[in-house]
Amino acid sequence: MTTLVTGATGHLGANLVRALLARGEKVRAFIRRQSDVAALDGLAVERAYGDLRDRRSIRDALEGVERLYHTAAFVSIRDGDRQELFDVNVVGTRMLMQEARRAGVRRVVHTSSFGAVGINPQGASNEHWTVSPFEPGTDYERTKAVSEHDVILEAVRGLDVTIVNPAAIVGPWDFRPSLVGRTILDFAHGRMRAFVPGAFDFVPMRDVVAVELLAMDKGIRGERYLVTGEHCTIGQILQWLEELTGHPRPRLAIPPRLMQGIALLKDPLERRFFPRRTPRFNYHSIRLLNSGKRGDSSRSRRELGLVPTSTRAAFADAVAWFRERGMI
C-alpha cells in the first residue's frame, strides 16, 4: 500500500513522513524539483516530482496510491503573493482532490488551517465556525477557507476525505524554517528587540501528526477536526524561550493599537516599494493576536482519541532541534 504525502519537505510533512515510515508504510513524497529536499535526506521515501499547479504531474504521482495526506500549502502574508496563494492553495487543492477521486484513492486527509475557522465571540471556536472569504483577513486565510469548500464538494462526489485544522505548529524538523521557527531563531540570536502583547493557539507538532494519523484511520468523510493546542500569551512564550535559550526576553511591549496604526501605514508602502519582501507582520496578523480567537479540540479528543501534550515541551523540542543543527 502506497501513501502519498504532498508538502513532504515542509515542517508538518517532514514530521509526518517520519511517523509513517516508523509505522512501516511505503511513502511517496510529492515534491517540486526546485525544493530543498534536506528534510528527506537519508529516508527510504519514493520521490514523485511535480507541482500542484500541474494536473498531469498530480495524476502521475497518484498512480497506485491508496492513501493521501495533503499537507502542501503556500503560506505567506505578503500582498504580492496573492495570485500564487490562490493558484496553489485553491486551484492546486481542487485539482488534487479531483484527481484523487478519479484515481480511486481510498482515503484522504486534507490539512487545512485554524485560519479557516471563524471566531466565536462567546468563547472557543469548534468545527462549526467557518470563515467567509469576504471577511477581513489575510489572503492565506481566505484561500484555506475557499479550498475547504472544494474538498467538501469532492467528498459529496464520493471522495473519502477528512479535514484537519491545526493552529500554529511548534516542533522539530523545521528545515525552512516556519514562521514560528523563525521567531524562535530571532529570539535566540537577539534580533527581537520588542514585542506586541497578544495571544494565540500554539499546538505541538506531535499532536498534529497524531491527529493526521488518527483522522486517516477514524475520521468521518467530509468532516473537520481541530487540533489547536494551548492558548498562550506572547509574554508566556517569551518567558519559555528565555528559559530554554538562556537569552533574555525583550521587555519593551508595543501597544497593539499603536502597531495596527503603524501597519496601516507600512502595509501599502511595502506593497508599493518592496513587493517581494517578506514582512514580519501586517495589520491582520496584529489584529489576529488580539482578536480573542481560540480553538476547541475536544472533538479530536473525543472521536479520534487525541491525547494532548505540552506546548512548552514542544518549544523545548524545537529549540533542541535547532541547537543540534547548529542554528542556535
Swiss-Prot record:
Q: Which reaction does it catalyse?
A: a 3beta-hydroxy-4alpha-methylsteroid-4beta-carboxylate + NAD(+) = a 4alpha-methyl-3-oxosteroid + CO2 + NADH; a 3beta-hydroxy-4alpha-methylsteroid-4beta-carboxylate + NADP(+) = a 4alpha-methyl-3-oxosteroid + CO2 + NADPH; 4beta-carboxy-4alpha-methyl-5alpha-cholesta-8,24-dien-3beta-ol + NAD(+) = 3-dehydro-4alpha-methylzymosterol + CO2 + NADH; 4beta-carboxy-4alpha-methyl-5alpha-cholesta-8,24-dien-3beta-ol + NADP(+) = 3-dehydro-4alpha-methylzymosterol + CO2 + NADPH
Sorted alphabetically, the Gene Ontology BP terms of this entry are: sterol biosynthetic process
A GO cellular-component term linked to this record? cytoplasm
The EC number on file is 1.1.1.270, 1.1.1.417
Q: Which SUPFAM superfamilies match?
A: NAD(P)-binding Rossmann-fold domains (SSF51735)
**UniProtKB keywords:** Lipid biosynthesis, Lipid metabolism, NAD, NADP, Oxidoreductase, Steroid biosynthesis, Steroid metabolism, Sterol biosynthesis, Sterol metabolism
Q: Which domain of life is it from?
A: Bacteria
Q: What top-tier enzyme class does this entry carry?
A: oxidoreductase
Xref: Pfam families: Epimerase
The record's listing under CDD domains reads: AR_FR_like_1_SDR_e
InterPro entries in the record:
Epimerase_deHydtase, NAD(P)-bd_dom_sf, NAD(P)-dependent_oxidoreduct
Q: Which GO terms describe its molecular function?
A: aldehyde dehydrogenase (NAD+) activity
Q: Does the keyword Oxidoreductase apply?
A: yes
Q: Cite the annotated pathway.
A: Steroid biosynthesis; sterol biosynthesis
Task: Describe the function of this protein.
Answer: Participates in the biosynthesis of bacterial sterols.
**Similarity comment text for this entry:** Belongs to the NAD(P)-dependent epimerase/dehydratase family.
Q: What is this protein called?
A: Sterol demethylase protein B
Lineage, uppermost ranks: Bacteria, Pseudomonadati, Pseudomonadota, Gammaproteobacteria, Methylococcales
